[in-house]
């Protein structure tokens, strides 16, 4: 899904599957596009929105907010698969956003490839707004790499809770499909427990 200044852009279609683009309300200083990636259609909508903003609001700054970066996990060539992140980064860089705000770039490769990228710190949001509303026994990361990255990045959060992680075995000849998954919990009893 794509939003311009909080309003959904390009979510309707004509009978032939072409998107219906309604004129968005524009701000006088900064226009924010928010990419909530669901499919490649959202990237086409972003390109259309950006072109519209260039023509109808050329003097205003353009900001892109992306909680999730599409193709961030394709940060290198794997077997016969292309380095998709590089080409998506080219698409974003050609749009010349003044700033791109991202919740998690996944790897340093994203930061190296994308111009004007700033990472959002979501630790305080988790601590102040999410955790008070839920009861958790531990934090679970999907794999060892995520555990190593986020226990350093979200130190306050990880000091308050026990941490467990998953261990994946992938079939790289089959698009990285997970063949086996186990949970590494060391001495933590997982029965009837909840995690974030």
PLM region descriptions:
Residues 1-196:
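PRPP-associated nucleotide enzymes
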């Amino acid at each position: 899904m794509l939003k311009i200044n909080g309003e959904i852009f390009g979510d309707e279609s004509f009978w032939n599957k072409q998107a219906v683009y309604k004129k968005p309300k524009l701000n006088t200083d900064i226009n924010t596009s928010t990419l909530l990636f669901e499919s490649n259609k959202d990237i086409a909508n972003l390109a259309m929105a950006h072109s519209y903003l260039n023509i109808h609001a050329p003097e205003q700054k353009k900001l892109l907010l992306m909680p999730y970066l599409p193709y961030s996990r394709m940060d290198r060539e794997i077997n016969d698969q292309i380095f998709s992140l590089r080409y998506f980064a080219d698409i974003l860089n050609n749009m010349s956003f003044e700033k791109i705000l991202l919740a998690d770039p996944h790897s340093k490769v994203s930061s190296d490839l994308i111009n004007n990228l700033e990472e959002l710190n979501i630790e305080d949001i988790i601590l102040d707004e999410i955790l008070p509303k839920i009861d958790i026994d531990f934090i679970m990361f999907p794999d060892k790499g995520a555990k190593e990255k986020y226990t350093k990045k979200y130190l306050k959060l990880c000091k308050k809770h026990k941490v467990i992680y998953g261990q994946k075995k992938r079939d790289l000849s089959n698009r990285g499909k997970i063949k086996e998954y186990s949970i590494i919990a060391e001495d933590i009893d997982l029965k009837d427990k909840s995690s974030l």
